[in-house]
Design a protein with these regions (language model features):
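Short beta-strand-to-loop capping motifs
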Residues: 1-2
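Short alpha-helical segments enriched in small residues
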Residues: 5-186
Length: 186
């Protein structure tokens, strides 16, 4: 451009066009990670959050609590990795696990709803899946992960089909949950 102002105007115009096309994937501007953006949003809306995570093994809770002041909105989490713990400690119905398995939409819905009720939070989220490298079945390959968001008005689920790499799956699923929170907030 001929000048800084003209160049800035062109960048702004193109940014608006880009936002129109991929806005759902933009969570902020600058260098703030999504967990910080979500934390600020929860604070601003005076909402609380709880987590039940299986395949992510606490990584999602780690991301949330890595932000200073997260205790103002994050009340706690459970990591019910085992079937028995999912039933006894979290409260997933045995018949749900028997009929659908741990890596299923009905199970993840129960997990998100139950953790929200147990912790008495505005929002409950959950993860369950096959992070890998083992544990796959023909209908549930490595990288199959269910995530859920629950508040008093709605429960939203997503089925992810990620990679064969365990750490990539754990990280990607955790970020996907944070994005699901962002997209689902009232």
């Amino acid at each position: 451009g001929d000048s800084y102002e003209k160049l800035e105007s062109e960048i702004n115009a193109r940014s608006i066009t880009l936002e129109d096309r991929i806005g759902q994937f933009i969570f902020g501007y600058g260098e703030d990670p999504i967990e910080k953006v979500i934390g600020k949003t929860l604070l601003d809306k005076k909402l609380t959050l709880s987590v039940a995570e299986s395949c992510t093994g606490g990584y999602l809770s780690h991301l949330i609590t890595s932000i200073p002041g997260s205790s103002a909105y994050f009340l706690g989490s459970m990591v019910p990795y085992d079937y028995q713990i999912k039933m006894r400690q979290l409260g997933v119905k045995p018949e749900t696990l028997e009929k659908y398995g741990a890596v299923s939409e009905p199970t993840i819905i129960e997990m998100a709803n139950i953790v929200r009720a147990k912790f008495n939070t505005d929002i409950g989220v959950a993860t369950s899946g096959i992070a890998g490298p083992g544990g796959a079945t023909p209908d549930k390959p490595v990288g199959t992960i269910w995530i859920a968001y629950s508040d008093k008005h709605q429960t939203v689920t997503r089925k992810l089909q990620l990679s064969k790499d365990r750490m990539i799956n754990i990280r990607s699923a955790s970020i996907a949950v944070l994005n699901l929170i962002r997209l689902s907030l009232p």
